[in-house]
Amino acid sequence: MHAAVIAFHPRRKPRLARLGDWMATNRRLILGVQWAIVLFYAFLVVLPAFLPHPHPEARLFSGDFGASSFVDGEACAPDGTPLPPQDKAPYAAQWHERLVLLAQYLFWGVWWPFVILSILFMGRVWCGVLCPEGALAEFASRHGRGRAIPKWLRWGGWPFLAFVLTTLYGQLVSVYEYPQAALLILGGSTVAAVAVGWLYGRGKRVWCRYLCPVSGVFALLARVAPVHFRIDRAAWDSHPGRTAAVDCAPLLDVKHMTSAAQCHACGRCSGHRDAVELSARSPNAEVLAGKTPRTSEALLLVFGMLGVAIGAFQWTVSPWFVALRQRAAEWLVEREVFWPLEANAPWWLLTHYPEANDVFTWLDGALILAYVSGVALVLGGAVLAGLTFAARMSKIDWRALALSLIPLTGIGLFLGLSMMTVTHLRAEGAPLGWLSAARGALLAVGVLWSGWLGMRLLFDHAPNLQRAVLALPGLGLALSVAAAAWILVFWLW
């Protein structure tokens, strides 16, 4: 008689879960990557600010495929007779000019647009693994004073306020175009992050959790990411013995975490109590759960990301802004009020680069603030009106319904930030015949995705079918207003 031997093998974890565990056990490697990015970040932001501004015709590839993009529209014969526009020899850019252009392209044309995409697809991995500002803030916190976090700092409205103020200030100093302005804003933010980290917390990312200007934006976009760290509450509670607390840098209660919004996806908690693992999910799951976000989060989405951000991307190409500026200048001249037309503001207050023939008057600054604020109030107000109407008809909270706009908002931010990418590529003579169709396809995806989420929320949570149907015009208004703003920018202006 032979005894049968039965061997039990532990369940092999899915690939994503194993990736999360790898992140947890390879913290030193991740730290090395973070410090490498810190150095690269410093190179992109600091060095160009101390180099001369490039010549207006300097190009990264001025001797390569970009050469044909240079056209002389003012060519004249020896006797002064104007000649038809014709190709001219490209300007021979110096090494420091190419370096500044490369830094601008990499930082604004590649880095930031694809950070937005990474949040949409992978959650806040950028924050937990790659962000140089977060790494510096945590390092300072590990060697700082370790004070308790004051109540005023934990106010939920800081992300909204910081995003709005940073965006407005960035437009006044032309942060996308000039390295000095970029160093002022981004360097200032980094210094503030280090200072907050040194003062508060103990090895935590207090700045990232409560004060970072883009933390609120990333928290909203991460809600539709198809991967997240899933918490198995039953496994957590049934795990034998005591375990050390999770070293969660953004100060989350990991056991009760149900949203990817604040999770930095750093992987430190992966495998904890055999209850935390990196997992795939439906990108719609968190929005369709119908949980109500904080009012400050909903306002950031409606008036910040769909208002201020669109206004900031829009004013530089808006004929309405040009007409407003012209009319205001004429009005001032007629009344002999000339000081608003003076361009004597310092560069750190208003754009002032005479060598690049780019200076803002006091009138320009006032009108930029007025235009962006006006767009925010009009667009945000219209979106809020539509959401409020739909919410009242369907008897659901408007803040929960606002989350359905995240896909359209995220895609819109990517399209807006990629305008700088397009500017650089067009200057180099890159073929862009595909651009209009690509923009249209992405915008359509955003509208359809957000529309589908909104309808699902209405029909799933409204008390009856009739109320859900009555709410549809409100949802349609919110979607139409947001889409129309981008249609103006890309196709009508």
Please report, for each region that a protein language model flagged, where it lies by residue.
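Non-ligating segments of multi-cofactor redox enzymes
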Residues: 2-261, 271-493
